[in-house]
Amino acid sequence: MSSSKYKRVMLKISGEALSGKKGFGFDFDVTQRIAKEIKEIVDMGIEVGAVVGGGNIWRGRNGEEMDRTTADYMGMLATCINALALQDSLENIGVKTRVQTAIEMKEVAEPFIRRRAMRHLEKKRVVIFAAGTGNPYFSTDTTAALRAAEIEADAILLAKKVDGVYDKDPNKYDDAKKFDKLTYIEVLEKGLQVMDSTATSLCMDNNIPILVFGLDKPNNIKKVIMGEQIGTIVSK
């Protein structure tokens, strides 16, 4: 067993992270590395739920000339492709996994049923939640916050391409300042790019800490679980 203070976590992985340096599609070396890092914490006794974004395949802003609802549904389907890719990488290394979707597609995945998801987690299966909330106008960040509340996760691990939360884009500004700790209110008031305001508010209302870190370096998921200060913690 681990000495982590977290028993059950929700891992949110951006779709872009799966594309690595390619910027689109999949970098399977990255997908396999993420799977190995998830296996590490599963082997420590941590129960893991996961939500993957769809930005490596489709982003709503790509469809500016489209109906917003249609564009959002396309994004939801993109997350299903990513969920199946992650499931495959996990099962190839012996991690028992289930994909649950908010839009029914029973030939490829289970429908989202909270009690069933909880049972899978108790049996040490990784549960990947796909197709967002099943509704347009909600991001995968909101999905992660909602599912985290539903499965009673102790924290959200927010894996991004940057290594924490900054006051401005560190890729554009050399003087960008990184925060070690923030409150939910500070994130909302400053308009910081952590999660969108709906997701942040959900975490605040349910007292779910958000641990923001970069996926660029190996073993960061385990480091965050073990309490190493490598990113930004958002809490009360």
From Swiss-Prot:
It is an enzyme of class 2 (transferase). Pfam families: AA_kinase (PF00696). Its EC number is 2.7.4.22. The keyword Magnesium does not apply. The keyword ATP-binding applies. It is found in: Cytoplasm. InterPro entries: AceGlu_kinase-like_sf, Asp/Glu/Uridylate_kinase, Uridylate_kinase, Uridylate_kinase_bac. UMP binds at G54, D72, T133, G134, N135, P136, Y137, F138, S139, T140. Keywords: Allosteric enzyme, ATP-binding, Cytoplasm, Kinase, Nucleotide-binding, Pyrimidine biosynthesis, Transferase. It comes from the Bacteria. GO terms for biological process: 'de novo' CTP biosynthetic process; UDP biosynthetic process. Residues 20-25 are annotated as: Involved in allosteric activation by GTP. Allosterically activated by GTP. Inhibited by UTP. One of its GO terms (molecular function) is ATP binding. One of its GO terms (cellular component) is cytoplasm. Pathway: Pyrimidine metabolism; CTP biosynthesis via de novo pathway; UDP from UMP (UMPK route): step 1/1. It catalyses: UMP + ATP = UDP + ADP. ATP binds at K12, I13, S14, G15, G55, R59, Y166, D169. Belongs to the UMP kinase family. Catalyzes the reversible phosphorylation of UMP to UDP. HAMAP family: PyrH_B. Homohexamer. This is Uridylate kinase. The lineage of its organism: Bacteria, Bacillati, Bacillota, Clostridia, Eubacteriales.
